Design a protein with these regions (language model features):
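A conserved active-site cap/scaffold subdomain adjacent to cofactor or substrate pockets
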Residues: 176, 187-209, 214-220, 229, ...
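Short alpha-helical segments in extracytoplasmic peptidoglycan/chitin-binding modules
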Residues: 290, 303-304
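Acidic-histidine catalytic/liganding microenvironments
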Residues: 6, 200, 293
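Residue-level signature of tetratricopeptide-repeat
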Residues: 307-308
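Conserved Radical SAM active-site core
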Residues: 1-176, 180-183, 215-222
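Long, highly charged, low-complexity intrinsically disordered interaction regions
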Residues: 221-292
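A glycine-rich phosphate-binding loop feature that marks nucleotide/adenosyl-phosphate handling sites
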Residues: 115-122, 211-216, 251-267
């Protein structure tokens, strides 16, 4: 709090391991959030990690107190989750994730905003973008809503105090995290899962965490296994291509070529495999075509288009 008052920090990440049981742990997190927002007047950014299996009312209360809420997937497939975390299931993770999505959409609609997050809208006009209306229609993302909204979710918001105004539900959206290297899934599986999460659950971000071996276990990599930091980096680059460059998972990888080349960034690797699309005429190429040129990003592509003389 002193760091916040002195302007050393602008936000914080709040997380916890399970203490006693999920309900008790989530209750303590909500109490902490309420103390920060009310007693200590912490109006900065708060990212809170939820506890799978906690009651709906506690998860909803956390959403009204925090700016961003995370329901961590941890592993990309139900098989790996069952193998490495048998106490968890896809159902206990995806159900609250769907409720967060629908409650965010409902509260955004009530104040006159689009139900989907703005980040999605910034990419909607790129042909083939995973956030485009046509892609959302094909994947069923637009019709995959309903039935999981927290009814009367606003009633779970903590009571306001004199100078404390009620907040929107998770205004910075929701995110999740996947561990890289703990199970044997390919990069293709990871990127496909990421794309589905963005489309079906309107996630703001998917985070990746390289697995660091710390325990001897036959189901886990050996202790001397190198930490896949470069692989994690390539997945973040691919994630960026999905969100801002109009790429799709099937363009970057395939079942025949399931893993990224760790010695080359995914966009450059794609360009080398599609030399028939190059060179391009910079003066006439469309914005989405410019985005596929290695070394050109959204800002540069926008400047090139604006600088043209007709």
């Amino acid at each position: 709090i002193e760091f916040y008052k002195r302007n050393y920090i602008e936000g914080l990440f709040l997380s916890s391991g399970v203490i006693r049981d999920p309900a008790y742990t989530m209750e303590q997190i909500c109490i902490t959030l309420q103390l920060l927002r009310t007693k200590y007047r912490f109006n900065g950014y708060i990212h809170v990690k939820t506890i799978p299996g906690a009651p709906d009312e506690l998860l909803a209360a956390a959403g009204f107190l925090a700016d961003r809420i995370s329901v961590n997937l941890e592993l990309p497939t139900a098989e790996s989750l069952k193998k490495l975390a048998p106490n968890k299931s896809f159902q206990t993770i995806m159900t609250p994730m769907g409720k967060v999505r629908d409650t965010i959409a409902e509260t955004r609609t009530l104040i006159g905003k689009d139900a989907r997050m703005e980040r999605s809208l910034g990419n909607r006009y790129l042909p083939g973008s995973i956030f485009g209306k046509e892609q959302l229609r094909l994947t069923g993302a637009q019709s995959n809503r309903g039935g999981s909204l927290w009814k009367k979710a606003a009633s779970f918001a903590p009571a306001t105090q004199d100078t404390w105004k009620p907040r929107a539900f998770a205004p910075a959206g929701q995110s999740t995290q996947m561990i890289i290297g703990a199970s044997d899934e390919s990069d293709y599986t990871l990127v496909q899962t990421t794309q589905k999460l963005y489309q079906n659950y309107d996630l703001k971000r998917v985070f990746y965490s390289a697995y660091i071996p710390v325990n001897e276990d036959s189901a886990l990599p050996a202790l001397e296994t190198p930490v896949p930091l470069l692989r994690e980096h390539r997945l973040y680059q691919a994630d960026w291509l999905l969100r801002f460059y109009g790429f799709q998972a099937d363009e970057l990888l395939s079942e025949e070529r399931p893993n990224f080349n760790v010695r080359m960034d995914p966009k450059c690797d794609w360009a080398i495999r599609h030399l028939e699309q190059f060179p391009i005429e910079v003066q006439t190429a469309s914005y989405d075509t410019l985005l596929r040129v290695p070394g050109i990003g959204p800002k540069s592509a926008g400047r090139i288009v604006k600088a043209r003389r007709y």
